[in-house]
Amino acid sequence: MQRRIMGIETEFGVTCTFHGHRRLSPDEVARYLFRRVVSWGRSSNVFLRNGARLYLDVGSHPEYATAECDNLIQLVTHDRAGERVLEDLLIDAEQRLADEGIGGDIYLFKNNTDSAGNSYGCHENYLIVRAGEFSRISDVLLPFLVTRQLICGAGKVLQTPKAATFCLSQRAEHIWEGVSSATTRSRPIINTRDEPHADAEKYRRLHVIVGDSNMCESTTMLKVGTASLVLEMIEAGVPFRDFSLDNPIRAIREVSHDLTGRRPVRLAGGRQASALDIQREYYSRAVDYLQTREPNSQIEQVVDLWGRQLDAVESQDFAKVDTEIDWVIKRKLFQRYQDRYNMELSDPKISQLDLAYHDIKRGRGVFDLLQRKGLAARITTDEEIDAAVDTPPQTTRAKLRGEFISAAQEAGRDFTVDWVHLKLNDQAQRTVLCKDPFRSVDERVKRLIASM
C-alpha cells in the first residue's frame, strides 16, 4: 500500500501553578480547558471542523487525534495543528481563571511522563489491508519498533537510585507487553484491538502505542515515515532477517539506556544483536526497496535522515542531525546548560528544562524558542499549521467530515459525527456511512449538506 491512511493521537500532560506551586488539580484544570468546548459541543468529546477529534481521556489528559492523512507532511502539519488547538484552549482557560479571581499559569506538555511516574501516550495509526497476515506484520515490525527510539526518541533524564541518566525514550520504561488488545492496563507495543474505522472486510487499523510524543517536525516525519515504509515492505513481501526478541520488554529498556546503540540485546534462540544492527537491517532493505518503488520525495527525505541518524549514532558525531532528532537536540541543550552552569545531570534545573522542552505554549516553551532560533528543523510552516486548525486534509474522508461539520454549525443544525458516520439529528435522522477513508468526494454527503 503506497498510499496509506495514517493518524496520530496525542495525550497532553496538564498542570496549573501559581508562583511555582500547584494551584488546581488536573481534573479542575481539565474542566477549565474544556469549558469552551462543552459550551458549543455539549460534550468533552467532539469532532472539529478540520476533521480531528478532541476529547478528555482517562486521567484528565486532553487528547487530540488528527484527521485521516495520506501523506507525511500533511500528517505532521495536522499533528502540529493539534498543539495550536490546545494552546487556544489554554489561553482561554487562563482568562477564565483570571476572571474568577484565580491567578495561575496553565501548562500543557506534549510529553509522556509526569513527575509522579505516570505515563500517557502518543499513538500512531496505520491502515493495513485485511488480507495480509497480521501475525507476520507484528513479528517483523516488533524489533523495528523496539529499536527505533535510536532514531526518533524524545529523550528523557531518568532519575535512578544511583544517578541521573539520559535515556533515548520517555515511553520505554512504561511498556509491559509486546502485542496485546489493552492500551492502559499493560501498555503493549502494538495494540491488536480490531477497530478499523473503515470497511472491516477490506482493512484493519494497526495501532502502535510505543512511540514518544515528538516536538521536532522532522522527528515526527521520521517516526511515521519509517514505520509506514516498513509496513509497505512487509506487504510487498520483502524478506527480513529474523530479529525476534527473546524479551521485547527488557530489550526496549536496554535500548533506551544505550545512546551508542551497540549494547547487544538477546534474540530468540540465544542469539544477540545490537539496536544499531537491527536498524541497519531495516534501513538497508529500505534503500534497496526504494530502487523498485514509485519515486516519492517525502519517503526519500525520510530514508536520507534515517541513514544520517544511524551514521551519527555509530560515529557518536551528531553534528549533521543535531537540529532534526528530538533526543539529540535535547541532549545537546542539556550539555550546553551543564557546561555553562557547572551542574550535574541530576540537578533539578535539568529536570525542569526537560519538562519545559515539551511546553506547547509559544514564546514560553523551550522547544519553541529553539525552533525560532533555527536550532530545530522545520518541514512545515506556521501558515500551513494555522490553516490546518480549521481546514481538513483535502485528499481523504476527513474532507467530507470537516465540510459536514462546518455546514451544520453554520446552519445551526444539530448533528452527530464519528470517524465513519455523518448524521443530522432531525426527524428523518438522515445518516451517511463513509466506510472508505481514501474517498474525499461523495455525492451523498453533498446532498446531505445541500438539504440543511
Curated annotation (Swiss-Prot):
Signal sequence extent: none
Superkingdom of this protein's organism: Bacteria
Note: The reaction mechanism probably proceeds via the activation of Pup by phosphorylation of its C-terminal glutamate, which is then subject to nucleophilic attack by the substrate lysine, resulting in an isopeptide bond and the release of phosphate as a good leaving group.
Function per UniProt: Catalyzes the covalent attachment of the prokaryotic ubiquitin-like protein modifier Pup to the proteasomal substrate proteins, thereby targeting them for proteasomal degradation. This tagging system is termed pupylation. The ligation reaction involves the side-chain carboxylate of the C-terminal glutamate of Pup and the side-chain amino group of a substrate lysine.
NCBIfam families for the chain: pupylate_PafA (TIGR03686)
Residues the record lists as binding ATP: R53, T66, W419
Similarity annotation: Belongs to the Pup ligase/Pup deamidase family. Pup-conjugating enzyme subfamily.
Keyword flag ATP-binding: yes
Main enzyme class: ligase
Gene Ontology annotations of biological process type: modification-dependent protein catabolic process; proteasomal protein catabolic process; protein pupylation
Catalytic residues in the record: D57 (proton acceptor)
Pathway involvement of the protein, from the record: Protein degradation; proteasomal Pup-dependent pathway; Protein modification; protein pupylation
Catalytic activity: ATP + [prokaryotic ubiquitin-like protein]-L-glutamate + [protein]-L-lysine = ADP + phosphate + N(6)-([prokaryotic ubiquitin-like protein]-gamma-L-glutamyl)-[protein]-L-lysine
Membrane-crossing segments per the record: none
Keywords: ATP-binding, Ligase, Magnesium, Metal-binding, Nucleotide-binding, Ubl conjugation pathway
EC numbers: 6.3.1.19
Record lineage: Bacteria, Bacillati, Actinomycetota, Actinomycetes, Mycobacteriales
InterPro entries in the cross-refs: Pup_ligase, Pup_ligase/deamidase
Protein name according to UniProt: Pup--protein ligase
